[in-house]
Amino acid sequence: MVKVIEMFFRIFFFCSMLVFCSFPALAGEAEARVVLNMNTGWAFHRGEVESGGQPGLDDSGWIAAIIPHIMQLEKKHCGGDIIYDGVGWYRRTFRVPSQYKDKQIKISFEGVMNACEVYLNGQKISAHRGGYVGFVTDITTRINWDRDNLLAVRVSAEYDPLTPPGKPQAGMDFYYYS
């Protein structure tokens, strides 16, 4: 009986210390993090654009898009019955106030189907494959503080043997988002 009580107190002590020691780390992380939603204000073009990641490109004729967006079904919704398996571009401008210069700035993507290249102010900063997995890109050193920044994402919905296609579109009760 004494051993059982002693074991109980050891487990209780260990769990208490684990919880107690994790609070300062969680509190500091919660105070430091600022999350901005960038799902609105995107311009979208279905098809390849040679300079899609460059700031000087005129995208005023592109379609307004809110993320998540279904690039593959645009054609179907416009009267066709073929799912688009090609390339598309998304572009958006944003500003970061200089008050955040001492912070780490990251962009989190919840998933891009199937593969993508991410550009900031005309420079390719990352690439990702695998539409079902999110990823994070650190943009801290590439920010134009207190000025417009152009974020451009080239998305490829082309067949990729590394990304499972799921089931046929006709049998789905959901959509793949780009």
Model-inferred region functions:
Residues 13, 31-32, 77-79, 102, ...:
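Hydrophobic alpha-helical context, especially transmembrane and signal-peptide helices
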